[in-house]
A protein has these predicted regions:
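Acidic, His- and aromatic-enriched active-site or binding-groove loops in soluble protein domains
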Residues: 118-131, 171-202, 206
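Histidine-centered active-site microenvironments of extracellular/periplasmic hydrolases
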Residues: 50, 278-309
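Active-site His/acidic residue clusters
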Residues: 167-169, 215-258
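Bacterial Sec-dependent N-terminal signal peptides
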Residues: 1-22
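Non-catalytic, well-ordered alpha-helical segments in soluble enzyme domains
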Residues: 145-146, 312, 321-357
Length: 357
């Protein structure tokens, strides 16, 4: 691949000049705790046949297995390995020398999401408790920019996101878990009824309702930035249910495809929207039983991945990186795609220049 150098010329408002960009809207999607091993390699054959983790190995093999790694991963993530592969970029396949890492040492959710959105791996962010985040996040920064105020929306399954993004200070609309959908939209009213009446086998709003709430909000209110945060992959992994972990990952890929196709059919979004897909942390693999887990004591749980697709992102497919990339680079990348320069409260973090022309 060719190395792209991006030169930023800044002025006081944080906007960029000297760079032509086409992205006017941004969609961000996270799959909580989704391992890079399945994203780039498909179903793990060792876990597949382990009856402790996979109840119906024959069914999973029929749906997702192939002797070919390329076929396996495409069966599991057809959108990533068709549209994104052909038109965008994927980072994190360590088998080809593409490394993406957590910069934070904790390797679990709140520190990971903090790093994604603030660009700073804060050592004070070291629990998953509902503590208001003191760090300024990139969505909060963009909410203050002309044309973006009140045009940012977040829909999450996990109910800690209002604290991670500090919605009370940032002014960002964040709808999480059991939050009501009090909008004048018949479809959103229906989703409100459905999510209030449905069973909650994982103790959280099912990802499908998080998705449809976000999609219907986009159709009704046309935000400039939409973030959808899925959670089921992490929950099923912790439960040791590999088959359900795979089913959720496959379903979330389909939801991402549906959302991308939806915006490509809308004139205000088509050819003006960039999609970023990533995760908050990885999981264990060197010790196979640790696929369920993550955290500071699991060496390889900080290995993550990024996918990007949009009008300012070259069609490179799998990208080999000369140097490791870090999760903290996503916040300035998000801003740069929209023509702004975001500086973390502390530390220095540069955008992923290859995602941007």
């Amino acid at each position: 691949m060719k190395t792209l150098l991006v030169f930023f010329f800044l002025f006081g408002s944080g906007a960029l000049i000297g760079q032509i960009h086409k992205t006017e809207n941004l969609i961000i999607v996270t799959l909580d705790g989704m391992r890079w091993q399945e994203v780039f390699g498909g179903v793990d054959s060792t876990i597949l046949v382990d009856k402790r983790f996979t109840r119906d190995s024959e069914d999973i093999a029929r749906r997702f297995w192939s002797p070919s790694m390329e076929e396996r991963r495409k069966k599991l993530f057809p959108f990533l390995w068709s549209t994104v592969l052909e038109q965008g970029q994927l980072y994190g396949d360590r088998n080809i020398g593409s490394e993406v890492n957590n910069a934070n040492k904790y390797k679990f959710s709140y520190p990971g999401y903090n790093e994604i959105f603030t660009g700073y791996p804060d050592t004070a962010v070291n629990s998953n408790k509902k503590i208001l985040n003191k760090n300024t996040n990139v969505l909060e920064f963009l909410n203050k920019q002309k044309g973006y105020h009140g045009k940012i929306a977040v829909f999450s399954t996990w109910d800690v996101f209002p604290y991670i993004l500090n919605k009370w200070r940032s002014g960002i609309y964040v709808n999480s878990d059991q939050d009501s959908l009090g909008f004048n939209s018949n479809n959103l009213k229906l989703i409100e009824q459905m999510q209030s009446l449905t069973t909650r086998p994982l103790g959280i709003r099912p990802d499908i309702f998080t998705y449809f709430a976000g999609k219907e909000y986009l159709l009704a209110y046309h935000p400039k930035i939409l973030y959808i945060a899925f959670d089921e992959t992490d929950d099923f992994a912790h439960a040791g249910e590999y088959d359900q972990y795979l089913h959720s990952a496959h379903a979330e890929d389909a939801m991402i495809a549906d959302l991308w196709n939806t915006v490509q059919a809308m004139p205000e979004y088509a050819k003006k929207t960039t999609l970023i897909v990533t995760c908050d942390h990885g999981r264990g693999d060197k010790i196979k039983e640790q696929w369920k887990d993550h955290g500071e004591d699991i060496e390889d749980a900080g290995h993550i991945w990024i996918a990007a697709l949009g009008p300012d992102t070259r069609a490179e497919g799998e990208v080999k990186t000369a140097m490791p990339l870090y999760q903290k680079q996503l916040a300035p990348t998000i801003a740069a795609l929209l023509g702004f320069h975001f500086t973390p409260d502390r530390g220095v973090s540069e955008p992923v220049s290859t995602i941007i022309y």
